[in-house]
Structures are given as C-alpha cells and as structure tokens.
Amino acid sequence: MADPENEVLRSTFPSYMAEGERLYLCGEFAKAAHSFSNALHLQSGDKNCLVARSKCFLKMGELEKSLEDAEASLQGDPTFCKGILQKAETLYTMGDFEFALVFYHRGYKLRPDREFKVGIQKAQEAINNSVGSPSSIKLENKGDLSFLSKQAESMRAQQKPHPVRQLIHHPKRESKRKGSLKSEKIVRQLLGELYVDKEYLEKLLLDEDLIKGTIKHGLTVEDLIMTGINYLETRSDFWRQQKPIYARERDRKLMQEKWLRDRKRRPSQTARYILKSLEDIDMLLTSGSAEGSLQKAEKVLKKVLEWNKEEVPNKDELVGNLYSCIGNAQIELGQMVAALQSHRKDLEIAKEYDLPDAKSRALDNIGRVFARVGKFQQAIDTWEEKIPLAKTTLEKTWLFHEIGRCYLELDQAWEAQSYGEKSQQCAEEEGDMEWQLNASVLVAQAQVKLRDFESAVNNFEKALERAKLVHNNEAQQAIINALDDANKGIIEELKKTNYREILKEKKEKENATMLDGQTRTAKEKETRKTKDEPEKVMKQWVQEQTEKQLEGVLSKETLGVTARQPEQRQREDPEKASWRKELGAKERGPGDTAKGQFGEAGRTEQNREETREIYRRPSELDQNLSDESSPRESEGLEKRLSKTDGGELEALGKTESGEIKEMEITENSEKIEKDEKEDEPIE
C-alpha cells in the first residue's frame, strides 16, 4: 500500500482548499483543518489558507493555535483585512475585548465592511457588559465597621506580611502589582461605579493620622482599607476574564434582586434599556415573531411597573406604549378580546394623564380591532373620535379611507362615497399616489352601489392610471374587472330606463284616453241636463196649472148640483113616479154601467190628486229655476205656456163637461131608486 501522506500530497492546492471549505461548512472542523494543513504543505505561508485553518481551530476551541495562524497571516501583509478580522475574532473569544476592539477599529479603517462594524459594536458591548451593574456594597467614611473585626482577625493570622508594609516598604512590588493591569482605563471600565470607591480608599491611605487609628479587637483602619482595595482588584481581574455571555447572565440575576429596586438607576442606562427594549419588540413584531414580541413586551412592562417615577419620569406614557405593543402582538396572534383590553388600558392612561398622541394611537388600534371582528359601526364611532387628533394629512387620508370602507361594508353607500372623496382630496394634497389609488377605488365602489355607473367608470379609469404609475399589476387586473362590471351595469341601466320610458308613455296615453272619455261623457250629461231641465219645468208648471183649474171647476159644479136637487124634486110630478119606476126598471142595466163610470171617475179623480201631490214642488224650486233660467228661456216659456194653455184648457173643459154630465146621470139614477124604495108598500 502507498503511504497516505504521499497520496494526499499528490493532490493540488485548490482541491485541498475546496475540500477544507466543504468540510468546514458541514461542521467537520477537524477534517477541514487537516485539509488546510495539507494545502499549506504544498503552498506554505498562504494567507487565505492560514485564515481558514484559524477559523477551524477557533471552532474547535484551540484558541492559541487560532491566534497563531491569524498572526502568521499578517506577517507578510499587516493590512490583510481577513487576517485582521480573524485575529480580532480570536481575541474577542479569548475575552481580551480591548485588543479585539483595537483590531476591529484597525480593520474598519482599512475597509469599512459590515463585519468590522458589527465587531466594534460587539466588543464595546462586551466591555460594558463585563463591567456589570453596581454592587450593593459601597464603603463610606461613616458608621461602625466593627462587623468586619472578626473576619479581619481571622484573616490576619493567615495573611502574609502586612499589606501596608508591603505597600510602604516594597514600592517595586506595588508597581509590579499595578502593572499587572493593562491600564487604568481598563480598571475604570471594569469597576464602573466602584472605581470611585477604589479612588476614595486610596486617598484614605494617604491620611497617616487616620490609618494609625484602631477599632475593636486591635484592628486598624489601615487593615480595613487595604481589605477593600484587595477585594476590588480581585473582582476586576475576575470580571475581565469572564466572557460576555456570563457577564450578561450575572447582570440579569442582579436585576432580579431586591437591592436593585431600592437603588436609583442612571437615567442614561434606563433610557438606553427602554429604547433598546422597544426596538426589539417592534423588530420581533415586524419580522413575524408576534409571540416573541408579546413575551418581550410583557417582561419589560413588569420591570417598568416596579420602577418609581423618580427613576422613570414618563412612566405613565411608557406603560401605555407597552400596553399598545402588547395589544398589537395580540392582534397578530388573533387574540382580539385580549387585544381590545390592552388598547383600552392604553386609552385610559392617555385620558387620565392628558396624552393626546397616546389617545390617538389607542383609538386607532381599538378601531382596527373592531374592524377585524366585523363590528364596523363601533369602528366608525372610534375612528370618528380620532379625526380631530389626526395631525398629518397622510394620517387623515388613511383614516377617511378606513371609515369609508366600513360604511361600504354596512351598505351605506352615500357615506362611503363622502369619506372616499375626503380621502382622495387628502391624498392629492399629500401627493401619495397609492392612497389616491385606494381612495379612487373606494369612491367608484360606492358609486356602483348607488347605481351611478358613469361616475364609477370615471373613477375606475383614474384608479387604473394610478395603478399603472405605481406598477401594481394586481390592482390593475382587479380594476379592469370592476370596469367591465360597471360597463355592464350601464348597459342594463339603459335597458331599464328605455323600458321604463316606454311603459310611462303607454300609461300616459291610456290615462289621456280615459280622461278624454270621462270628459266627453261628463259634457254629454251636462248638455242633457241643460236640455231636459226646461222641459221638466214646463211640464211641472203645466200640470200644476191644470190641477188648479180642475179643482176650481169641480168645486163650482158640485155646488151647483147640490143646489138644484131639492128644486127638481119639488117640480117632479107625482105622475111621473110610474114612469120613473119603468125607467128605473129599464135602466137598471145601464145604471150598473153608470155606477162603473162613476167609479172610474172617482178613480181618475184619486189618481189626479196623487199626481198633483207628486208633482207639487215648493216655491223655492220654482224661484231657483226661474233665477237660473235666462231671459231668453223665460220668453220662450211664456210663448209655450200661452200656446199650450189654450189647447189644454179646451181639452180639459171638454173632458170635464163630459164627466160632469156622467156624474149627474148617475146621481139622478140613484135618487130615483131611493124614491122607488120609499114608495113601495110595506108588506
């Protein structure tokens, strides 16, 4: 078998580099480092290969080897950016944040890439985090320090020569100890607020009268001061060696402890924390992680509620903002009831502390929740309350559009058109083409519901032009479809209007014919009435006149007959009695006829009286008729009356004379019969 090393060395340098990069991406860092080593055997000192192998060592945790390869890549070219970046990354991983920051800055000056910028921020943050939060213990030049006496006495027995003596009698050792720190700047960054305490303790050492003083059990003030200084130095060394992740965990634990609640935070730290938290919450929500945004917001809200107003002057405004963030995350998660409660809390805080911007924000979000769940009228009421609080024209554009959209959903097309036109006007003032597009579509849709198809087509055409300007293909297609529907609506409306006009004309003709017929019949009736009235009046008048004359004649005749009867009886001769008997016997048959004639005469008389009563009218009717008749008619009536009066009177005279004669005959026959009955002998 052949030697594997010789077999490996038979490959080319690019093949080893490609193999190492592939293995590195697969996570096989040891094999990748071996491939890069083989490549360096073929081409030693290659900068890119050294940087690649340094990355593998860094992933494997061999930090020293990684640093050696990174420094080796810079030997030939100190400005090699990849080598500088790799060295900075290695130093950062080793915990040497200061030197890492130096190399990040050096690389950023040579080539301002994103990697160097991120490295600078990362190293600076690591330095700040490694310093940690201020400790709860702070030494002051007051109070009783006897609580340290027992601990100091036990430590004195175990300690080596006195530290003050070392400080006084061994200045070289002191300088060496101080020289262990890289610089006072590093110590200041590591200790943070405690660096002031360290300086204070060092100043106390210069006061010889103070350090000679003793406390209980023989413990001197000098011993206590040196104990504090030694503690701070050991702490700074420890924090410097920690990696950023451990420093963050330590800060997180310290923030949860009670001493942080009683201690004032720096305003700058509080502001940075709040701003950073709000940015993280917003970033998580916009990136699609609504659950993470909700958890982050609830966590920050819990912390802010623990602070007092001295630490956070605008605490109320911040709490309302966090409730708003929580509500927005709940909307994205579909938790509408919880979202409504969160936004209402935001609104309550805004009203309580008179925060107009927060009130506008809360009303906006509450309206969105109502619109999402389909309660459009409540959304309209909420957004209409927000209108006076809207500051910018663009905000009004959006607000009017949403209100109009809700009215359109409620089938209130007039209101939807009105708000759509307001939105369109504001969008034109702002010069926002997309909102002009949205407003035009809203107005057109409202006009379609109002069946104003011509105006709808005009607005759809405007919207189509704006959609082309903003290159919105989906909107263009939707508007084209809506235009087709609107044009079809116009055609249908024209058909309906034509049909309605035809029906209207037909009804008008029918009504006209009916009116003509009615007017004609009415006129004919009127003419008939006018013609018949004078004839009726004449007949009535003639009948009344004849009846009066008949009454007068009958009354005279009856009086004359009654007066003649006794005279005739006296004049009659007794001789004629027999003749009367014979005549009565002979004329018994004709007497019956006379009786029938007399009965008929009585009937005619009765009929005449009835007709007289029927045709008898009050004088007022005669007066009205006489008043209404014209002079010409009165003249005609007089002529007719004169003519008819003569003829009718003659006829009446004849009939009356005949009737009177018949009545006389019947009366005479009755009288004769009575006399005969009286003359007959009584058996």
UniProtKB/Swiss-Prot annotation:
InterPro entries per the UniProt record, alphabetical: ODAD4 (IPR040111), TPR-like_helical_dom_sf (IPR011990), TPR_rpt (IPR019734)
Annotated Basic residues bias: 167-179
Disulphide linkage map: none
Function as written in the Swiss-Prot or TrEMBL entry: Component of the outer dynein arm-docking complex (ODA-DC) that mediates outer dynein arms (ODA) binding onto the doublet microtubule. Plays an essential role for the assembly of ODA-DC and for the docking of ODA in ciliary axoneme.
Organism: Bos taurus (Bovine)
Biological process annotations from GO: brain development; cerebrospinal fluid circulation; cilium movement; epithelial cilium movement involved in determination of left/right asymmetry; heart development; lung development; mucociliary clearance; outer dynein arm assembly
Biased amino acid composition, Basic and acidic residues: 521-537, 566-590, 602-620, 629-675
Gene3D superfamilies assigned: Tetratricopeptide repeat domain
Segments of this protein annotated with the region Disordered: 158-179, 510-537, 553-683
Gene: ODAD4
Keyword Repeat found: yes
Each TPR repeat, start to end: 13-46, 47-80, 48-80, 81-114, 275-311, 320-353, 360-393, 397-430, 437-470, 592-625
Pfam families with a match to the protein in the record: TPR_8
Keywords: Cell projection, Cytoplasm, Cytoskeleton, Repeat, TPR repeat
The protein, known as: Outer dynein arm-docking complex subunit 4
Known partners and oligomeric status: Component of the outer dynein arm-docking complex along with ODAD1, ODAD2 and ODAD3. Interacts with ODAD1; this interaction may facilitate the recruitment and/or attachment of outer dynein arm docking complex proteins, including ODAD1, ODAD3 and ODAD2, to ciliary axonemes. Interacts with components of the IFT complex A, including IFT140, TTC21B/IFT139 and WDR19/IFT144, and the IFT complex B, including IFT46, IFT52 and IFT57. Interacts with CFAP53.
